[in-house]
Regions:
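Glycine-rich phosphate-binding loops of nucleotide-dependent enzymes
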Residues: 2-229
Length: 229
């Protein structure tokens, strides 16, 4: 799997959400994508997944152009997505959520995400952390080539975050790449060998997490000023 984002610009009216962003991801890989609020992280996932139409630039998955495809067409190419607010079918059971539209055996995916004992419960009865795990199980059940995760640890406490991080560690299976948007930098540092930073719609850093705190552009983005060296 090879994802190539080349010079992508996305505008919403007078607002430039992404400006000339270039990024490449191979497999297996778990790429962290971070940045302050409003940096363009979710918009980049939307552009890859067909939910936002770039004004300029191209996006290719294994040589296939994604830029003009609808979300369902992108999904058929092997791209799966989770969202900041989990999108699950609340009137269906947990196992029905995983099986829906796929015809797969939900058992292995529920076991992998710690939801096996709740398989017959309605999804509406799940707590926030369980809902996030269910959405991840749904995404993984399609055995995607590219997995886009938008703040899967958002709103979770320390114990729940540790449990989710353990699940995410195994998400970049052979033949799959993962782009992980996450505000909790300790999760990024633990899971990712590479991290890209967006600020005001532009990519300002791309490298190992250990180098984040030494980069003046990253410090400027997060602190509003460059830290003296």
């Amino acid at each position: 799997m090879s994802l190539s984002v080349d010079g992508v610009t996305v505008r919403f009216g007078a607002t430039t959400a992404l400006s000339g962003v270039t990024l490449s991801v191979g497999r297996p890989a778990l790429l962290g994508l971070v940045g302050p609020n409003g940096a363009g992280k979710t918009t980049l996932l939307d552009a890859i997944g067909g939910l936002a139409r770039p004004e300029a630039g191209t996006i290719h998955l294994d040589g296939t152009a994604l830029t003009r495809l609808a979300p369902d067409a992108v999904a058929r190419l092997g791209v799966a997505r989770t969202f900041q607010s989990p999108r699950i079918f609340t009137r269906m059971t947990v196992e029905e959520n995983v099986r829906a539209g796929r015809g797969v055996d939900p058992g292995p995916w529920l076991a992998a995400t710690g939801l096996e004992e709740r398989r017959r419960d309605l999804a509406s009865a799940l707590g926030p952390a369980e809902a996030r795990r269910l959405e991840l199980a749904r995404a993984l059940a399609g055995e995607p080539r590219l997995l886009l995760l938008d703040e899967p640890c958002g709103g979770l406490n320390a114990t729940e975050t540790e449990a989710m991080a353990a699940l995410l560690a195994g998400s970049a299976a052979p033949g799959r790449a993962v782009i992980l948007v996450e505000h909790k930098l300790r999760v990024i540092g633990r899971l990712c060998e590479r991290v890209a930073v967006l600020h005001l719609g532009e990519k300002i850093f791309d490298g190992p997490p250990a180098d984040l705190h030494a980069d003046p552009r990253v410090l400027e983005a997060y602190l509003g000023r460059a830290r003296a060296s």
